[in-house]
Amino acid sequence: MALETFVNSEPFTFGVELEIQIVNTHNYDLTKAASDLMRLIKDAKFPGNITPEITESMIELSTGICRTHDQALGELHAIRDTLVSAADQLNVGLCGGGTHAFQQWSERQIFDAPRFQYISELYGYLAKQFTVFGQHVHIGCPDADSALFLLHSMSRFIPHFIALSASSPYVQNVDTGFHSARLNSVFAFPLSGRAPFVLTWHGFEEYFTKMVNTGVVNSMKDFYWDIRPKPGYGTIEVRVMDTPLSVDRAAAIACYIQTLARYLLIDRPLKLSEDDYLVYTFNRFEACRFGLEGTCVNPQTGERRTIAEDILDTLDRIAPHAAALGSRAALDEIGALAKARVNDASWLRTIFKQEKSLNETVRQQCLRWRE
């Protein structure tokens, strides 16, 4: 199968995708209701889209093509409200969070769609274990080579996105010690991790053709990279974030990525090399394990600082681009998180410490999703 032609798109436009948990309102475990939700919303009018995901206990919402923080926030609120209304009719709850705190993966039911059934047959139990919930952000790119430049430039900031969005400290009734345990589920897939260091679309086409010829992949969907190009959309897709507990947080993180993209493509502050990835896995682990308190190492200078400090320094550098995009309010929220060194994982642990119940913690996640 040939690689799709890269469709040039309007630079720095963006779209947001959120995978959402569907829970019962008895004990707040995951429940099977995606098909029923899809049936209820099929005639509803809302921006963007709502689609099923790999199991019946999750559903995905996505915005249209956005240009500003206000637009993204408005669309996310409208789609969220549509889904919440349908969920109320079914007496089920919806919430964010990268993992469900106490669900048992073996109880999950794969959604009845050809690709999901194929994934289940190929990956076995990993498919059901993949009932985890992420935020993806697409960024429009003017051409294919710019997309690859942006992909590898953006990789330096992967720890920021993980730490800011982290909302998955609990797995199967256990505090994992991680801020984002969700990404540990992604690591199990053979084509996860980072994209190959290729800076021209011609070179990327050659790489893709070789992979297809091995029989390992059929399409770009088979790559579970942290950031991957989406040629049919003319975007790169940042895929490392946990689904935040609120759409407001999701919009702020998306606009941080949008503003970074403008800075990286217009100012071109980084000289890219394969050596940029020497500390990639270390920095990624630190963000997953310790959140904003984690350490990140600059691959070019060797300087070590906390991820929170690195975010605050980055916000100063990209401030002119935030002004140009109208994303100052979003970046103020990001700065407040970095200064306080708290994220949604911190909030979940605080609630559990107060309530001594993961069931109650998930119930409060559902309340927060409505805010």
From Swiss-Prot:
Record-given protein name: Putative glutamate--cysteine ligase 2
Similarity comment text for this entry: Belongs to the glutamate--cysteine ligase type 2 family. YbdK subfamily.
Gene3D superfamilies: 3.30.590.20
EC numbers on record: 6.3.2.2
InterPro entries xref list: GCL_type2/YbdK_subfam (IPR050141), GCS2 (IPR006336), Gln_synth/guanido_kin_cat_dom (IPR014746), YbdK (IPR011793)
Enzyme class: ligase
A GO molecular-function annotation: glutamate-cysteine ligase activity
UniProt KW Isomerase keyword: no
Record GO biological process: modified amino acid biosynthetic process
Domain of life: Bacteria
Keywords: ATP-binding, Ligase, Nucleotide-binding
Keyword set includes Nucleus: no
Biological classification of the source: Bacteria, Pseudomonadati, Pseudomonadota, Betaproteobacteria, Burkholderiales
Reactions listed under catalytic activity: L-cysteine + L-glutamate + ATP = gamma-L-glutamyl-L-cysteine + ADP + phosphate + H(+)
A Pfam family this chain is assigned to: GCS2
Organism expressing this protein natively: Burkholderia mallei (strain ATCC 23344)
NCBIfam families assigned to the protein according to its UniProt record, in alphabetical order: gshA_cyan_rel, PRK13516.1
Signal sequence annotation: none
Purpose: ATP-dependent carboxylate-amine ligase which exhibits weak glutamate--cysteine ligase activity.
